[in-house]
Amino acid sequence: MEFVKQADTEVFEAMQAEKNRQQDKIELIASENFVTKAVMDAMGSILTNKYAEGYPGKRYYGGCEHVDVVENLARDRAKELFGADHANVQPHSGAQANMAVYSAVLEPGDTVLGMNLNHGGHLTHGSPVNFSGQLYNFVDYGVDKETEQLDYDAVLEKAKEVKPKLIVAGASAYSRSINFAKFREIADAVDAYLMVDMAHIAGLVATGEHENPVPHADFVTTTTHKTLRGPRGGMILCKEEFAKKVDKAIFPGIQGGPLMHVIAAKAVSFKEALSDDFKAYSKQIVANAKLLGEALNKEGIRIVSGGTDNHLLLLDVTPLQLTGKVAEKALDDIGITTNKNTIPFDQESPFVTSGIRIGTAAVTTRGFGEEEMKEIASIISLTLKHHEDEAKLKEAAQRVQALTEKFTLYA
């Protein structure tokens, strides 16, 4: 950051402060992770200088022979990771990947079946405040009130009732495995396309820790950060028959020039994800999440659906007489970063919520293991149960500091 320091002290100081925040706090936001230095180097490379509208071998600018190599590496590695026919690595985000699939196969007003945001879905799965809910007729499905898990029979009944052109599977706050084969059966029963948004679980899918949606779905979208531990960006995988439609939907449909420095970082992260080290890392993410959930349960913290099958846990804080907003602030004050989150059948607004969402991808990258999960659960319990007790909060903050000093970030 030395060049930034010389050129712009204000930006440098903000970057330095953020570096300190990441070092000094425990990152439990489920959608965040820490990239490797190699990925970071690619992101900050000279490839940011190159415009490359189009696709490898078919660009609208000259001088693209080297960025073509980079994009082909990213595409080939993505296909190898997930066993896909086709990969488009140009989407700037997961939201744009979803938008591209919608525009490739839908007309405005078409009916789509997606997961309710309050039950664990995503804004781009039909929220009325999002383009998806404004352009298309989204109808939602949710979880069973008793089990707080997906009820596939209910999803099938809803699909038969509304006859969607597209079914969207995948979630942003659902801690259980998703049966993609069952979603394929449901889609086939109503002659619908199936799109899976695996943004949260892509890293787990790549290593076999979660069922792979690629053999079942017509389209699979994802972000490249989160459990995949790449740069912030998006990607679309699809069957060969949809490749041209998908590519056209991205460019020239909704994007212009691709971010070649980000695509380079994607390529690097995909190579990392193909390694045995990443497989071990991914396995540890799930082990840590399960252990953290068990430890929190022993502390008397209610876990939505009773546990987790992936990297994510959704905590219901209402039995503690708290809101998600208050819980998030209390934890942040002692050095644990989370986010307030709605839970199924939540009575609070999205700005208040009844829960918090946590995940283990970032802390696992940092080196935290089973003993640290038990300690984190104990600290969370102490903080939430005594959120107005200064002595208890001071103790919690000191215990957080002991953990962050033990596991240095970007040493």
From Swiss-Prot:
Gene giving rise to this polypeptide? glyA
Pathway assignment reads: One-carbon metabolism; tetrahydrofolate interconversion; Amino-acid biosynthesis; glycine biosynthesis; glycine from L-serine: step 1/1
Q: What is this protein called?
A: Serine hydroxymethyltransferase
Which enzyme class? transferase
Tell me which residues bind (6S)-5,6,7,8-tetrahydrofolate.
Answer: L117, G121, H122, L123, E241, S349, P350, F351
Q: Name one Pfam family in it.
A: SHMT
Q: Which organism is it from?
A: Oceanobacillus iheyensis (strain DSM 14371 / CIP 107618 / JCM 11309 / KCTC 3954 / HTE831)
State which Enzyme Commission number(s) the record gives.
2.1.2.1
UniProt keyword list: Amino-acid biosynthesis, Cytoplasm, One-carbon metabolism, Pyridoxal phosphate, Transferase
- What Gene3D superfamilies has UniProt attached to this entry? Aspartate Aminotransferase, domain 1, Type I PLP-dependent aspartate aminotransferase-like (Major domain)
- Residues annotated with N6-(pyridoxal phosphate)lysine modification: K226
Q: Which family does it belong to?
A: Belongs to the SHMT family.
Task: Name any GO cellular component annotation.
Answer: cytosol
What cofactors does this protein use? Answer: pyridoxal 5'-phosphate
Compartments in which it is found: Cytoplasm
SUPFAM superfamilies on file: PLP-dependent transferases
Quaternary structure? Homodimer.
Reaction catalysed by this enzyme? (6R)-5,10-methylene-5,6,7,8-tetrahydrofolate + glycine + H2O = (6S)-5,6,7,8-tetrahydrofolate + L-serine
Range of residues in the leader sequence: none
Provide the GO MF annotations for this entry. Answer: glycine hydroxymethyltransferase activity; pyridoxal phosphate binding
